[in-house]
């Protein structure tokens, strides 16, 4: 929150993490964050640890507290081996659809068919996909499912031929800053090569994200470089697409009641 005004942040997604036995504490913490941020943080509840009955009750008694469900990380230990179209998750999406909630997920590798099946069965739910595992199949998914969206963030910043984002392959702030500044043009040109055509095929469903990881990735010096890169990349998109990708798509999806394309 301290950097919101300094970095001119209009809004962001915040994940609300809890467990069923501590539901009351989870809701109180979420209410506090929403109030302290003056609504700039759109809260997503991680739904996989709650029963369907609890999710329905939360929405009944706390309408408007959460803008979506997620992040559901299918690549991560707790969900590893589960599929986005397992019945457990289809039940969650049904609650999301009833309450106009976005569903954000980070699928594991080769789960595009499972994601597509979930999107097909829930056409009234907006699915915000995140993560490099869906980078190759995302266009085909968007072609087939108008309710699929995608956020791009650190995976834009790569040094060829590495598949990993520089923000995650760097060991510390100093290493990141040195590598970033020495290879800025290489990083930017690769990002344009990888993403420009895709974004312009579906200009209303891609959005710029700011996902980070270790504590040092939130350092002000790092933030300045990420902002510089984001602006430089956006400037390489067609003028009619730039604002959409930068913030309009995200605001329409999340900040304005989940209205989509």
List the model feature ranges, each with a label:
Residues 34-37, 83-208:
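Catalytic pocket-lining loop regions of alpha/beta-barrel enzymes
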